[in-house]
């Protein structure tokens, strides 16, 4: 990182606004021309905000809520008040370089990242199911050009981290890169029976290796990537408030192991007016979980193939045509020595297309459609101890996901757009059967989104202002019904979410940047939901605020560059259940950091996260026949130092 990282915010804002291509648009659309709500953060911005895992993105993206429900493999993600009670079928999907990530791997470390794009609102036309709230698209650095390397180490009262990456030019056409990350969370729970003082510790290792074929004078390009992530954790504690306050418990120490292996081959061919893209991916994840509810083992293998053709038909018309295939095999086993097994196979075929047509120099029209066929088979062995009969069932569904958008470039720096888009959560069968009623399965949950947005640059490029008004109606919502412990996942009635999103970036000088973002909305159950009609949707705060400030001290004061950063975020009250009986009150988290760029090769960052040591819950559930609830809790105050070396 050069010294200009801190001293050229003018360059950064001009680059991002005028020439940044939004890869998640799949049509190479510029940020200032896209007709949907998009937020982008570069690697430098993420570093200054202390974002090094996907769950940290809520520090910089207002309206994004990522919280664990038990452990990080079962996370809840909310955008625009849309979340999912079934953690196997989220409403927000995460992609890394165009490859869909397993639902149990949403909260992964950010390794070798170039930037992160957040698309808000249903994205069913381009991305299919599980994108009702939006998508998070992670774009990594690719080895192009000269050889380089990076190493960094962090130490804090809560964890230690080691990071390393290297890029190598093998010849004029062939490049390779590798990235590694190791994280050790120390833990702070005292286990009374064993007197262990770090009973909630964890270790995680992630690695990525890639080979790029990028010839200068050939239309063909290719990238082969192999990645691995290994988590060994004791994080899944469900504590009473008293146990959390005292940081001690007599519960058995939980265990969680998660291994994820990912393989991807991306190929491109430039035919001139048409660019062909192929993305082939295979991801395998294994989970072993021993917790307060027993023992659970599960494996999931996902094979996917996407083909796309982007064509610039004329100066006024560009088109995208694509096809998608996915085969997902899930295999679970409940309890040590138990014969209860569940195998679910899901096969998906989809065709999709989108066209952008310029009606004139200022107004363009976007039309898109996706047609998806999904077939699912469930083979459950039954569980006599839970009085659940065995079943072998098949289910299939066809889904159409249309989109229409209209954009008006009022001036070179101002754009207004409106859109109607759709999204859905696929139907199928429960991956964790709890009742014989699960044999009937459930149908797709579908959402329709209306949006009016704007994006403008004011005051001689000193102010960036964007926002959107949105309305989302969801039909056939998928909910767990019945008595706790034997609930059935089924379709009920309607839900509705509406609100306002605002983002402001102010650059009063080249050395000072101010960011402010907020979301203000209402999300509630509507007709067809019996006793919960009118209640607020779980994990749907009415208000979120994110504020940040970055200031580079005058360089004459120091040798090198010193930057001061602060980020704060407010989340209003959140309900953990549909009946709205369990909740977390509104809270504010504040982070501070000082970064010292000694020279172009060496930098140091002193940081404190959650400086006020604010306590907050991320999940709660009631103990049956009791007024006491068991909960998961957020991370407390962290103080640490990071040292980074680049060459």
Q: What feature does the model see in each segment?
A:
Residues 54-57, 76-80, 95, 115-118, ...:
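N-terminal periplasmic accessory domains that precede
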Residues 55, 59-99:
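Extracytoplasmic beta-strand/coil segments of soluble accessory domains associated
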Residues 99-122, 441:
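Short acidic/polar hinge/loop motifs at secondary-structure boundaries
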Residues 148-150, 154-185, 194-233, 261, ...:
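Transmembrane beta-barrel wall of Gram-negative outer-membrane proteins
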Residues 196, 201-319, 326-328, 464-466:
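Outer-membrane beta-barrel domain signature, strongest for Gram-negative TonB-dependent receptors
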Residues 266-291, 409, 415-421, 443-500, ...:
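Membrane-embedded beta-barrel scaffold of Gram-negative outer-membrane proteins
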Residues 318-319, 364-365, 373, 466, ...:
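Gram-negative outer-membrane beta-barrel transporters
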Residues 569-577, 595-647:
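C-terminal beta-signal and adjacent terminal beta-strands/loops
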């Amino acid at each position: 990182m050069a010294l200009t990282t801190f001293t050229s915010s003018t360059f950064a804002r001009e680059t991002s606004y005028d020439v940044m291509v939004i890869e998640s648009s799949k049509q190479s659309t510029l940020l200032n021309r896209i007709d949907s709500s998009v937020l982008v953060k570069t690697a430098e911005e993420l570093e200054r905000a202390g974002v090094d895992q996907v769950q940290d993105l809520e520090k910089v993206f207002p309206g994004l809520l990522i919280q664990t429900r038990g452990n990080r493999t079962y996370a809840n993600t909310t955008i625009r008040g849309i979340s999912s009670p079934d953690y196997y079928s989220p409403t927000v999907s995460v992609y890394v370089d165009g490859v869909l990530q397993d639902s149990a791997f949403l909260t992964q470390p950010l390794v070798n990242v170039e930037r992160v794009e957040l698309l808000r609102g249903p994205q069913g036309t381009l991305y299919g199911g599980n994108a009702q709230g939006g998508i998070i698209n992670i774009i990594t650095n690719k080895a192009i050009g000269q050889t380089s390397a990076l190493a960094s180490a962090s130490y804090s009262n809560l964890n230690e981290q080691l990071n390393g990456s290297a890029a190598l030019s093998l010849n004029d056409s062939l490049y390779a890169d590798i990235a590694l990350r190791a994280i050790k969370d120390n833990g702070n729970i005292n286990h009374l029976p064993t007197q262990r003082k770090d009973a909630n510790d964890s270790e995680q290792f992630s690695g990525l290796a890639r080979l790029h074929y990028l010839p200068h004078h050939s239309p063909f390009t290719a990238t082969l990537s192999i990645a691995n992530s290994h988590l060994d954790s004791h994080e899944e504690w469900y504590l009473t408030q008293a146990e959390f306050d005292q940081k001690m418990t007599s519960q058995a120490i939980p265990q969680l192991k998660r291994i994820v292996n990912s393989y991807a081959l991306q190929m491109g061919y430039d035919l001139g007016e048409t660019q062909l893209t192929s993305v082939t991916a295979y991801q395998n994840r294994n989970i072993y979980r021993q917790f307060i509810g027993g023992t659970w083992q599960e494996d999931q293998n996902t094979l996917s193939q996407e083909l796309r053709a982007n064509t610039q038909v004329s100066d006024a018309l560009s088109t995208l045509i694509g096809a998608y295939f996915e085969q997902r095999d899930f295999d679970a086993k409940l309890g040590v020595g138990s014969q209860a097994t569940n195998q679910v196979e899901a096969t998906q075929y989809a065709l999709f297309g989108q066209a952008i047509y310029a009606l004139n120099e200022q107004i363009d029209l976007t039309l898109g459609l996706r047609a998806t066929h999904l077939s699912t088979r469930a083979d459950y062995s039954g569980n006599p101890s839970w009085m659940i009969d065995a079943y072998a069932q098949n289910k299939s569904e066809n889904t159409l996901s249309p989109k229409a958008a209209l954009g008006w470039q009022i001036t070179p720096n101002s754009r207004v757009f409106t859109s109607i888009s759709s999204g859905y959560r696929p139907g199928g069968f429960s991956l964790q059967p709890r009742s014989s009623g699960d044999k009937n399965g459930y149908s797709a949950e579908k959402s329709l989104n209306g949006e009016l947005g704007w994006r403008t640059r004011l005051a001689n490029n000193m102010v960036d202002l964007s926002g959107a008004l949105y309305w989302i109606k969801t039909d056939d919502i998928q909910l767990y019904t019945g008595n706790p412990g034997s609930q059935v996942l089924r379709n009920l009635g309607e839900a509705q979410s509406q609100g306002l999103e605002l983002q402001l970036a102010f650059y009063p000088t080249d050395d000072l940047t101010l960011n402010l973002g907020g979301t203000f909305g209402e999300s509630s159950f509507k007709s067809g939901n019996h006793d919960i009609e009118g209640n607020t949707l779980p994990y749907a705060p009415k208000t979120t605020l994110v504020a940040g400030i970055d200031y580079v001290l005058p360089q004459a004061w120091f040798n090198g560059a010193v930057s001061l950063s602060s980020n704060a975020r407010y989340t209003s009250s959140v309900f953990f259940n549909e009946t709205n009986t369990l909740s977390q009150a509104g809270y504010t988290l504040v982070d501070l950091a000082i970064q010292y760029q000694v020279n172009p090769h060496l930098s140091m960052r002193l940081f404190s996260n959650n400086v006020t040591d604010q306590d907050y819950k991320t999940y709660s559930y009631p103990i049956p026949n009791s007024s006491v609830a068991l909960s998961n809790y957020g991370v407390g105050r962290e103080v640490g130092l990071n040292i980074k070396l680049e060459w």
